[in-house]
Amino acid sequence: MNQIFNLILVIFTIFFSGCNSFGQQKDDYSAKIDSLIGAKSPRGFNGVVFIQQNGKTKYAKAYGFADLNKKTPLKIDDKFSTMSIAKQLTAVLVLQEVEKGTIDLQAPIRKYLPDFKYAWADTVTVHQLLNNTSGLYSDDIDRPLKFKPGTAFNYSNMGYYVAGLVLEKQSGKSFEALVTSLFKTCHMHNSAYPNEINSKFLTKGHTVRKDSSYILNEELNFGPEHCFGSHLIVSPADLAKWNIYLHSGSLLKPATYKMMTSYVITNKHTLFSDDPIGYGYGLRINDKDNMLEIGHTGFHLGEGFTAVNLYYPKSKTSVIIMENVAHENFDIAYYFEQEIRKIVKESNLLK
């Protein structure tokens, strides 16, 4: 009898320890992220890390301050600037007009902006604006094109500015109205167009110098042209909602979504890889290591924000990191974004 009891006890012990170890294996990333951020080296982390899978929150923590001067603690639902993550929203709005037949991706800009003063409007297409092959420089629209349109890659905020002008002209609506409607569609209730009223609810951006001193940016100096591809107000959780709506087929037809997430040009980015990866419409496409990764970064030193939004379609996982600091030392600007990405990619979460 004692032998039978002991055997049953051993079986139960093995079973429950197996369940426990399985549970531990299931989350092999949270403690590593905590430890990484707790080390505060080579710089401190000041922001929110938000990880979601299949609509369920897997990790959500805020570290640091919304205002470094006042030492106001950051909260999970605080609002940050998207920086260039906004480009994918602009791209979706343009593609929705493509589906309506009001915009032709292969048409030159002149077709939609006949009075545009730049000669390159006769040759640069909407497609080239969206995938950064227009030849336009990043922040100076008056400079001659860097190369023949369609022949190379050059990241261009001005390209998205022009795409935004085309969008407003062909839709007959302001970008503010369009993006506000898009936020409602995606139930992004903690996000907004950065008008004067909404901007008051944005966390303060901080520019961190190489000597570790910082400048608190009381007001953002973005003009309307930056909203097309460089600045919208979102919370990390809302950005995860955006990923669900975009990648589930709720915003674009399958063929249109495929256009957005396909690429004909490649480019290097320090966060993703040492090798060139694809650039679609407002999205970087990394298909180099048997784990499709779709995402974009955002960084603005002068306004003081750093962000990354990553999505892994196979496991329906979002990894969102938003900081209200931007470091002048670019070697460490994306340090935590890079390291957290590595932790997640090596974890069981994506398997």
Locations of the language-model features?
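Bacterial Sec-dependent N-terminal signal peptides
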Residues: 1-28
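Hydrophobic transmembrane-helix microenvironments that flank and shape a buried ionizable site
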Residues: 3, 81-84, 191, 235
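Catalytic loop of the DD-peptidase/beta-lactamase superfamily, centered on the K-T-G motif
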Residues: 19-62, 168, 176, 180, ...
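Active-site-proximal loop and beta-strand segments within enzyme catalytic domains
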Residues: 43, 65-173, 210, 215
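Secretory-pathway/luminal and periplasmic proteins that interact with or process carbohydrate-rich
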Residues: 58, 116-124, 135-139, 185-195, ...
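Catalytic-site signature segments of enzymes, centered on catalytic residues
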Residues: 131-201, 217-218, 224-240
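Mobile, glycine-enriched helix-loop/loop "lid" segments at the mouths of ligand-binding/catalytic clefts
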Residues: 198-214
